[in-house]
């Protein structure tokens, strides 16, 4: 599902490779996205984030819209979704696969193996901050940008000879959204601000101290009632003029300058516990942010962000098109070969990971941290048959290793919930993750069999744990995650079977993610011994064997896996001269499927077989 990717992220490592951190030069190129008109749709807005909060800034002069996210606002509540019928029917599906009845096998898997309770919960928008500026519908000299050097969004324009500026940050250090409003003449800042939300039954109140609150709860989805309670709080600090708060609208009139603050919090503690107090958390974030002036808050925010950004620099030459808007540079790229745009793209990829994955928080999901819908495409979940992994490919090679912490915690948590699923669905020890999970760390097979009958998500995620060790040599880290690696390897050791044609050890049933094969006349994905499965398990077992030697533990298990590796299907070259995607030579040279899953080991590991 390559369309579901973290915006602008996918080619960072493929295009650039391993970049060594270096000292900043005295003359450092400026990295920014800039435009000469406001955003018309959500995908044109500029993304800000601090790992926990996301903001999409439209930059419209008359009525600013800043769409807001908080990383733990998801539909539903704690649950797992393993289907107990799977234990009986997976062997029957396997028999059909081995008999060459692939479509029948896939149909049976959809009916009897896939989750019946739910297919995972959607990540949901909080809502919007809307700021109306009377008289600002006619303007000139418009400019907006996203500074990748400082994680700030700037909007500038002129109305009736007055120059206005908005500066927005999602503060890493204060954990609130701040919008700074200034003009080049005194007394010109007048606005009405409010919080809105697409959620049903939200409650909006005006409180003492010129504060607006918006409270709500996440959505019901697939029969699972939403239980994530959230609250947003809106206030402002003005110099000069008047401030008032009535009927959920915060108004400032005739100020010299003003700063708008938004805090958001939920009751989410972890995937099993939602007993937190969202009101007290939102109050605390806001009150602590109001202690310091905006200039100090911005300084702290920028310094925090740049500690990540400046670990790596990429200079591909002079910026020859700095006076051309970013959208035009992208449009012209095929003719201009704009090297500085490539460098900007590289830093934009790093920027997005910094802004959507901070230690202590949730990992970057299908849309990072940015989503304007209650029910987004593919639920904006954690799709584990390439998308979640792909978000983090740049982390080690671009010197953002510590931003893996949310991913590593997710892996630990799905290894816990996945033990239950392994027992219920497969009668196996160890742990399993299929092709998707969410904030509740569901691990059952979901959606329909063409995508969902794939038990190798855990094996792929384990590669990220091993990768951390390979980059750092940190044996204590390896010791802490070794049980996760081992238990995943144990699961595959128990569920893999010998297929009847070659007597090879294979995963069955499974699929080469989402791609149909000619063994079913292009009607089914379900198969046995898919090359990607073979590669992932080879990689996992090899890592476990190496880790056992490094840690001087589990020698018998390592020796057992070494023997099992010899029984696995090898990589095979088909009659087109291609690396086969499946155990049989089913590849079609006209296949234009967006996945090339059987090449995964070439990218993520060392294809030594």
Model-derived regions: residue spans:
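Bacterial Sec-dependent N-terminal signal peptides
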Residues: 1-24
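Aromatic-residue-lined binding/catalytic grooves and analogous aromatic/hydrophobic interfacial grooves
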Residues: 22-450, 456, 465-469, 475, ...
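Acidic helix/loop microenvironments that form the catalytic cleft of cell-wall polysaccharide enzymes
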Residues: 487-490, 511-513
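C-terminal, helix-dominated tail/subdomain
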Residues: 508-540
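Short "domain-exit" segments at the C-terminal end of structured domains
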Residues: 607-609
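Aromatic-lined substrate-binding rim segments of carbohydrate-active enzymes
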Residues: 481-484, 490-493
């Amino acid at each position: 599902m390559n369309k579901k990717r973290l915006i602008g992220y996918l080619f960072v490592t493929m295009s650039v490779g391993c970049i060594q951190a270096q000292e900043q030069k005295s003359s450092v190129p400026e990295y920014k996205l800039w435009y000469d008109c406001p955003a018309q749709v959500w995908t044109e807005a500029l993304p800000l984030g601090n790992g926990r909060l996301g903001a999409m800034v439209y930059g419209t002069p008359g009525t600013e819209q800043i769409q807001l996210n908080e990383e733990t606002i998801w539909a539903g509540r704690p649950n797992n979704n393993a289907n107990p019928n799977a234990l009986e029917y997976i062997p029957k599906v396997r028999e059909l696969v081995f008999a060459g009845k692939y479509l029948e096998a896939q149909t049976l898997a959809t009916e009897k193996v896939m989750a019946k309770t739910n297919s995972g919960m959607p990540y949901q928008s909080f809502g919007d901050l809307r700021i109306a500026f009377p008289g600002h519908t006619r303007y000139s000299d418009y400019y907006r940008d996203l500074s990748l050097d400082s994680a700030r969004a700037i909007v500038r324009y002129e109305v009736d000879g007055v120059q206005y500026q908005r500066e927005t940050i999602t503060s890493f250090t204060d954990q609130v959204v701040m919008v700074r409003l200034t003009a080049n003449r005194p007394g010109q800042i007048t606005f009405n601000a409010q919080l809105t939300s697409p959620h049903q039954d939200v409650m909006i109140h005006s409180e003492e101290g010129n504060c607006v609150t918006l409270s709500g709860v996440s959505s019901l989805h697939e029969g699972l009632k939403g239980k994530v309670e959230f609250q947003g709080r809106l206030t402002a600090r003005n110099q000069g003029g008047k401030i008032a708060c009535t009927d959920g609208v915060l108004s400032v009139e005739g100020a010299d300058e003003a700063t708008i603050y938004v805090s958001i919090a939920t009751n989410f503690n972890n995937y099993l516990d939602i007993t937190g107090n969202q009101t007290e958390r939102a109050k605390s974030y806001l009150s602590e942010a109001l202690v310091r002036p905006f200039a100090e808050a911005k300084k702290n925010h920028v310094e925090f962000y740049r500690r990540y950004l400046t670990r790596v620099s990429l200079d591909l030459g002079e910026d020859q098109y700095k006076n051309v808007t970013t959208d035009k540079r992208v449009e012209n790229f095929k003719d201009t070969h704009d090297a500085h745009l490539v460098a900007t793209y590289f830093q934009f990829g790093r920027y997005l990971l910094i802004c959507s994955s901070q230690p202590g928080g949730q990992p970057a999901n299908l849309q990072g941290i940015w989503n304007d819908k209650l029910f987004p495409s593919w639920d904006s979940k954690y799709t584990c048959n390439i998308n979640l992994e792909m978000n983090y490919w740049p982390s080690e090679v671009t010197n953002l290793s510590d931003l893996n912490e949310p991913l590593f915690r997710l892996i630990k948590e799905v290894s816990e919930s996945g033990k239950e699923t392994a027992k219920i669905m497969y009668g196996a020890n160890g742990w399993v993750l299929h092709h998707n999970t969410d904030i509740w760390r569901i691990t059952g097979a979901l959606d329909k069999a063409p995508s969902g009958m794939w038990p190798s998500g855990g094996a792929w995620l384990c590669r990220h744990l091993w990768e951390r060790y390979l980059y750092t040599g940190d044996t204590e880290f390896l010791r802490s995650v070794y049980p996760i690696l081992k238990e995943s390897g144990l699961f595959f050791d128990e569920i893999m079977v010998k297929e009847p044609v070659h007597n090879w050890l294979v995963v069955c049933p499974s699929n080469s993610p989402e791609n149909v094969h000619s063994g079913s006349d292009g009607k089914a994905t379900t198969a046995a011994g898919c090359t990607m499965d073979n590669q992932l398990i080879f990689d996992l077992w090899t890592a476990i064997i190496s880790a056992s030697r490094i840690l001087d533990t589990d020698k018998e298990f390592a020796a057992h896996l070494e023997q099992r590796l010899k029984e696995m299907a090898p990589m095979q070259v088909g009659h087109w001269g291609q690396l086969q995607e499946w155990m049989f030579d089913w590849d079609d040279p006209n296949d234009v499927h967006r996945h090339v899953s059987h090449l995964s080991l070439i990218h993520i590991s060392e294809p030594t077989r």
